[in-house]
């Protein structure tokens, strides 16, 4: 549900990024411009001059620094997501039974009683729904920072990479088809890697992002300076590695931590099954007598 809710939010941000125009001097004012654009522009200029006017390297370093600063939030999100998924496998029979009660309930009191039972199940399996909801936090934290960097690259101030534009094979101040294609491919791969770790019921949304993200990235990059394509390429490459490594590590960690719960559940099932068989045997003996 959380990921489905984020899809329209992300699409809205894409439209916002495409639609805002800081190319005109009279538009360069306001809260967002002064709070996020100006500081990011100053950082880009400082890094560029520090690297002997290599503004391509400055963009790469700045993107990596931002991603590393946000890494603890993202890792916490990965961990909570995997732990919740593994615990849901154990708690699913209890949760399904309570959800059935909610469907059958006719009064508000019955619904409240069922919801109370659900909270007890969450407590029993040490599941905190709030942690899942807080998974949106890293995205919300990084959004104004990333948007500030986006506008600095899309609408550069005088000097900077407009005067020192060359990096690798392309001109940072002009569109470049190859860096645009690279950015599109990397965002497709990033969405694909993310979708692999999603539950089956959410995977369709992941497949939608595999199509929508590259199209939006290519569309915006193709009509913008290639500095923007460089930013997206570096960011996507970092996210691919981050997602793959985090999913591998936290998936195994969650399985190890939840394994005792699964063993206890299987043991309880076996004991219940054994008691049921014993009851049937005793019942048959009594009938024979």
From Swiss-Prot:
Required for the insertion and/or proper folding and/or complex formation of integral membrane proteins into the membrane. Involved in integration of membrane proteins that insert both dependently and independently of the Sec translocase complex, as well as at least some lipoproteins. It comes from the Bacteria. The keyword Chaperone applies. Belongs to the OXA1/ALB3/YidC family. Type 2 subfamily. Keywords: Cell membrane, Chaperone, Lipoprotein, Membrane, Palmitate, Protein transport, Signal, Transmembrane, Transmembrane helix, Transport. It is a multi-pass membrane protein. A lipid is attached at residue 20 (S-diacylglycerol cysteine). Residues 1-19 form the signal peptide. The lineage of its organism: Bacteria, Bacillati, Bacillota, Bacilli, Bacillales. A lipid is attached at residue 20 (N-palmitoyl cysteine). It holds the Pfam family 60KD_IMP. Residues 269-289 are annotated as: Disordered. One of its GO terms (molecular function) is membrane insertase activity. The keyword Lipoprotein applies. This is Membrane protein insertase YidC. GO terms for biological process: protein insertion into membrane; protein transport. The chain crosses the membrane at residues 55-75, 133-153, 166-186, 210-230. It is found in: Cell membrane. It comes from Staphylococcus saprophyticus subsp. saprophyticus (strain ATCC 15305 / DSM 20229 / NCIMB 8711 / NCTC 7292 / S-41). GO terms for cellular component: plasma membrane.
């Amino acid at each position: 549900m959380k990921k489905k809710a984020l899809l329209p939010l992300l699409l809205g941000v894409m439209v916002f990024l495409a639609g805002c125009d800081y190319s005109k001097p009279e538009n360069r004012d306001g809260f967002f411009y002064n709070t996020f654009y100006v500081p990011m522009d100053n950082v880009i200029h400082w890094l560029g001059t520090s690297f002997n006017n290599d503004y391509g390297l400055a963009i790469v370093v700045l993107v990596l620094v931002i991603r590393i600063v946000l890494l603890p939030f993202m890792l916490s999100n990965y961990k909570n997501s995997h732990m919740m998924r593994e615990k849901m496998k154990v708690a699913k029979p209890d949760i399904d039974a309570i959800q059935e009660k909610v469907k059958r309930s006719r009064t508000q009191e019955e619904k409240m009683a069922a919801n109370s039972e659900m909270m007890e199940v969450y407590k029993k399996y040490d599941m905190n729904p709030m942690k899942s909801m807080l998974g949106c936090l890293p995205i919300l934290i990084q959004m104004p920072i990333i948007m500030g960097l986006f506008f600095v690259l899309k609408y550069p101030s005088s000097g900077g990479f407009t005067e020192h534009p060359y990096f690798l094979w392309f001109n940072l101040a002009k569109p470049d088809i190859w860096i645009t294609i690279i950015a599109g491919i990397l965002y497709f791969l990033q969405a694909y890697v993310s979708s692999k770790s999603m539950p089956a019921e959410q995977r369709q949304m992941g497949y939608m992002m595999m199509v929508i993200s590259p199209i939006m990235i290519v569309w915006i990059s193709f009509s913008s300076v290639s500095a923007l394509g460089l930013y997206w390429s570096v960011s996507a490459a970092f996210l691919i590695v981050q997602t793959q490594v985090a999913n591998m590590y936290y998936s195994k960690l969650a399985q190890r931590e939840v394994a005792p719960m699964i063993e206890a559940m299987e043991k309880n099932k076996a004991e219940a099954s054994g008691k049921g068989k014993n009851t049937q045997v005793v019942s048959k003996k009594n009938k024979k007598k």
